[in-house]
Amino acid sequence: MEKTTKNGIHRIRQEGGKTIAWAEESGVKVLEKDGYYFKDLAKTGELLPYENWRLSDEERAADLAGRLSIEEIAGLMLYSPHQAVPPMPGGPFQGTFDGKTYLESGKEPYAISDQQKEFLEDEHIRHILLTNVESPEISAKWSNELQKRAETLPYGIPINLSSDPRNGAKDSGAEFKSGGSEISKWPEGVGFAACFDPEVAGQFAKDASREYRALGITTALGPQIDLCTEPRWMRFVDTLGEEVEMSKKLTKAYCDGMQTTEGEADGWGKDSVNTMVKHWPGGGTGETGRDAHYAFGQFAVYPTGNFEEHLKPFTEAAFHLDGPTDCASAVMPYYTVSYGVDKKNGKNVGNSYSEYLIKDLLRGKYEFKGIVCTDWGITQDPEKTIEGFGSRCYGVQDMTEAERCLLAITNGVDQFGGNSESGPIVEAYKIGCEKYGEKAMRERMELSAKRLLINIFHCGLFEDPYLDPEESAKIVGCEEFCRHGYEAQQKSIVLLKNSAKRAPEGQKGVLPLKKGLKVYIPERKIGPSKAFFRIDLPAKTEDPLPDGLPSKYGTRVASPEEADVALVFIESPACNPYSTEDLANGGNGYLPITLQYRPYTAKKAREVSIAGGDFRENFTNRSYLGKTNTAYNEADLDNILECRRAMGDKPVIVCATVNNPMVMHEFEAEADAIIAEFGVSRAAVLDVVFGGYNPTGRLPIQMPKDMDAVEEQSEDRALDMETYIDSEGHNYDYGYGMNYEGVLPAWKK
């Protein structure tokens, strides 16, 4: 047995028992029984079952759930809005300290804000979503401050911090992503699919779980396991691809790696992070690629009736893990209305409000016993305009917020993402008592409390929720984890084209480039655009290599005329799928989502949309047949074509950041080499360009022949698109890739 005290935290390490830790200022005492020590979290002077670490997590959670008031249970069922540490004024996630902004307050960056105190003390919230942090050390100190305050409150229930994915190598066109600080950097989700090696995803999960725990995070809001069978969806890059068998393998590797603590019989322990797989029952089938964050994209459709395949990453992987934890801890339903799926009740409502999808399928047929947590912001009253970025209570807008909460709870939902006020849940309980009886409602609320508490017990937080900030700083972004992440970035890069036309003597293709060349890299120009929150963004110019070209590769020059080679960085086309101007001019507001750069007119779109109907619209047909849209970043294509003209017989290399499949015929023939990457660092790309890494990645997607092929594929069907064949006869289909020697061997399942 070893007793230590550091930074006001007492810790007892017990041979044959659990390590316990408590804060001096919390007032918690220690109980001794049978030669072991236990925390007296309830401050009763006796060892209660939930305080006894010798009992199972299930027994402890059931005991504590039975002791909580309805108000306390309601607090557990909440999930805070996004929290930044520290919350900077002017940012999207603000906070105050004694009524002052952080900069005015003079507080330490790890201080608890007024709003966070209210979450904990008045609303009984114990689940908090962390976004940006100043540093790992600050995150650890902030986590400790939260846990200290929680330990002083009734029952001493610890905080379960969570995070969206935060290890992306760069902000790859995904504004809803959390920002990691000084953390290992990995490819985006579909980049793991491009590795065609589940062990890479498994290594990420193991490393990230260690980093998460060092930051205080015990729940990952991921992985995102939607089968992305619709190529225009804006969240395509975050998924694990569209091929179901690969997605299943990656899902298992990810969840097992995150949740498993080596050496623990049931897998749960100090290195474990709960996974919340999303989005049930699959969010990758939005009609024509529109996204359900917005009411204009609320409908998921299944034109070929392929609904069941989209469940498989959940039902055949996440719910049946190979590791000892057995099953992903939690599931998040998506915002979507899964249109026409509920044949039993005939209701088209948001997934969390669907009795068929949650109660009958998820809880019933597939027997999921973990937490069901809604996506963020679905219970409040809706926005007045269909373009507004507000509540997504699709199909239940005529209910009160409390009635919506009750409907979700009776379906089997345990938690409400982004909700920080317990009042509507308490009111839902009261309505439920009148409808179902007090005994039944109390049992239902306790069931959710038990599920939520089990995940906190799983991670050992009731015994020791405290971090050593100095150790956290050593773990997060350590050399080993950063190396693993960088290797994964390299493995995820796909070489699509490597023409021999301008290849140096002795090489089969133009790549790798010789070092010491003069390199021209044009700036990118992006036109006016819409941000994730539907805010208008002005046109901008950006340098794809703002820190310059490393001298070990060559010299960057100002014009094509001076250069030996042009290196053109582009991103896949992006556009605005909804226009208030079109609506004002008598249209329906809906525009085609284009995957090409030049203006696209939708000549083969559906005449009548599959889904439609919203109380803010006086029509149901969301078709955009005959309408035209243009990518914000059309100038990316101009850069390629202008470089080709100016470079004459000198090579042009294109490096594409691929957030969605792309129409390649606009520029492929003009490029000597094309590299596709899925959210990796520029350094990893330059390794492939200059011979530092012979590429091994394969396309985890299909590249369409043209936009007609995109319109003709089905939103719910994988690998059903006519693919592009390049000027050298290579088919840009799923599994295709090259290395410096030529085309990789054909991929086999």
Cite the ranges covered by each PLM segment.
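Glycoside hydrolase catalytic-domain context in secreted enzymes
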Residues: 1-749
